[in-house]
A protein has these predicted regions:
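Elongated, amphipathic alpha-helical interaction scaffolds
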Residues: 1-291
């Protein structure tokens, strides 16, 4: 078998490719909202194709039923999703009203934003959790004037079964991912992915998608699994190292923060161990190598 090489830069994901399809996307919307819409013509895709932050890209966004939905797929826990979504939604809304006069006396209407993350990483997480932008504020306030909440759904196989059963594509995606992980423990990753693709096609699990996109799906699956394991290994290695390696991680963190001109974060991190660890986790989740 020829080795499949995948470069470490932004690539499409299986999740994103699946839910670029409007029928799949509407099915996912219905599953989350317990609705039964069928007209995909009313669904307006607003995904930011050029919105890349630290190797990450806005996955899927769309307007439907006067709502602006931002869907993101994550295989690593990222507490900074509210902040990223703030950037995304501001960009999307700016593009929607670019020719409107914000100084006009008439109110400019915009769709209601809603933010969802679909998590399927290997770290144990609750079936559902809420992330808040206010958690990142250096000064806490009971009712902050700017808030943004993100609902995180665990879509690993066996979680949120009501939603999974309502959206066949989402459930089959979870089955596919679980099988790749299972076989990857028994054989080389490339072989595990090939075997999974062959079996899923035979068993009618994402079969149409995999037949049409076999080569790309294999490359993406290898990349996604390898990246997930890479970040997990780095984090565990850092957490379990001794003092010398710990100091090395801290020095690396300080160097990155200085390079990014995040001097306030650097000062805060030197005074707060928990905040220091939070920054390390953030940089790992955003694709920083060798943290």
């Amino acid at each position: 078998m020829n080795e499949v090489k995948v470069q470490r830069n932004y690539k499409d994901s299986i999740f994103r490719m699946l839910f670029k399809d409007k029928e799949n996307l509407l099915s996912l919307y219905n599953a989350l909202n317990q609705t039964d819409y069928t007209d995909v013509d009313g669904l307006e895709i607003t995904t930011l194709e050029n919105a890349i932050y630290m190797n990450y890209k806005n996955d899927v966004s769309f307007v439907f039923d006067f709502e602006l939905m931002l869907y993101e797929h994550q295989s690593t826990v990222n507490p900074n999703m509210p902040l990223r979504d703030l950037f995304y939604v501001a960009d999307i809304l700016q593009k929607r009203i670019h020719d409107r006069d914000l100084y006009d006396s008439n109110l400019i209407s915009v769709p209601l934003p809603r933010f969802v993350v679909f998590y399927n990483g290997i770290d144990s997480q609750p079936e559902r959790q809420t992330l808040r932008l206010s958690n990142a504020y250096e000064k806490k306030q009971e009712n902050p004037e700017l808030e943004l909440t993100v609902t995180v759904y665990n879509i690993n196989l066996g979680c949120n079964e009501e939603i999974m059963n309502a959206c066949r594509t989402l459930k089959e995606y979870a089955m596919y991912v679980e099988r790749v992980r299972t076989y990857a423990k028994q054989m080389p990753l490339a072989e595990a992915v090939e075997k999974t693709v062959d079996e899923c096609i035979a068993e009618e699990i994402l079969s149409d998608f995999l037949r049409k996109n076999r080569a790309e799906a294999i490359k993406m699956s290898i990349y996604e699994y390898d990246e997930e394991l890479h970040f997990k290994t780095l984090f565990e290695r850092g957490r379990e190292t001794g003092l010398e390696q710990g100091e090395s991680r801290i020095n690396k963190l300080n160097s990155i923060l200085i390079h990014m001109d995040r001097l306030d974060d650097l000062k805060h991190a030197t005074q707060d161990k928990a905040y220091q660890e939070q920054l390390m986790a953030e940089l790992l989740s955003e694709g920083m190598q060798d943290m």
